């Protein structure tokens, strides 16, 4: 009785595999998508004239990160109101590096918005005194 049960079970399994589309060939697994990740994002150079004047702001940039993980397009999405801060933000982001997002195991470009904050220093930088002397002198 047991051999007959095993034979019937094996036959049912084979029929079930064929019915489910199992042909014995394996299908390559689909790679899970990954998201864009920042790798190297050094801060921007703060324009000394604005730092000395205590002027800050936020420049929000629209950045296209290419498949190599580097910014390929950088534009100002929302200005800080200070062109020098916006330009400093653009220059900084131009040198940033990312790990590109992937879809189906392949890197893809992605567009993101990046806020770059400029907060004036608590204490006046030493360079400010040199600028003051140049202006007076």
Predicted regions and their residues:
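Bacterial signal peptide processing site
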Residues: 21-24
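Short proline/glycine- and basic residue-enriched helix-capping loop/turn segments at helix->loop/beta transitions
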Residues: 28-64, 88-135
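A short acidic/small-residue loop/turn micro-motif
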Residues: 78-83
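Residue-level structural signal for beta-strand termini and adjacent loop
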Residues: 76-77, 113
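C-terminal motif of bacterial Sec signal peptides marking the signal peptidase cleavage site
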Residues: 16-19
């Amino acid at each position: 009785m047991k051999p007959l049960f095993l034979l019937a079970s094996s036959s049912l399994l084979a029929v079930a595999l064929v019915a489910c589309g199992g042909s014995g060939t394996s299908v390559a697994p689909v790679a899970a998508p990954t998201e864009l990740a920042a790798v190297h994002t050094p801060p921007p150079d703060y324009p000394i004239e604005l730092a000395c004047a205590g002027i800050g702001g936020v420049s929000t940039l629209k950045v296209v990160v290419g498949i190599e993980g580097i910014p390929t397009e950088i534009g100002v999405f929302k200005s800080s109101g200070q062109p020098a801060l916006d330009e400093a933000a653009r220059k900084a982001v131009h040198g940033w590096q990312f790990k590109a997002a992937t879809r189906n195991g392949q890197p893809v470009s992605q567009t993101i918005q990046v806020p770059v904050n400029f907060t004036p220093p608590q204490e006046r930088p030493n360079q400010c005194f040199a600028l003051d002397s140049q202006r007076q002198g």
